[in-house]
Amino acid sequence: MVSGLAPVKRGEVYWVNLDPTIGTEIKKTRPALVVSPDDMNAALPRVIVAPITSKGQALGCRPELVFNGQPARVLLDQIRCVDKARLVKKMGDIDPTLWHDTLLQMLG
């Protein structure tokens, strides 16, 4: 769990423990992008994340980008709310211009 560090911010990427899961939910500890707004992240013990993978089917709801020098897809179809205790370690940030419009289209 990430503790004693700066507040969690939208656009940051963390290693997140997603287990246990059910059915086709994405499993294991993997990178995930924080998509929840900063006011929510500061006020609540939970954040909304979208897992990141280097595999999987290319879909319009899965923006493709490069993260830490590797091709990646943000799985906006697998968004979930997780307790901050599931956040293992901060990995970096992803510019919102690479994913935010797709998120708005999905939710709009």
State the predicted function of each range.
Residues 1-108:
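Conserved functional hotspots at enzyme active or ligand-binding sites that engage polyanionic ligands
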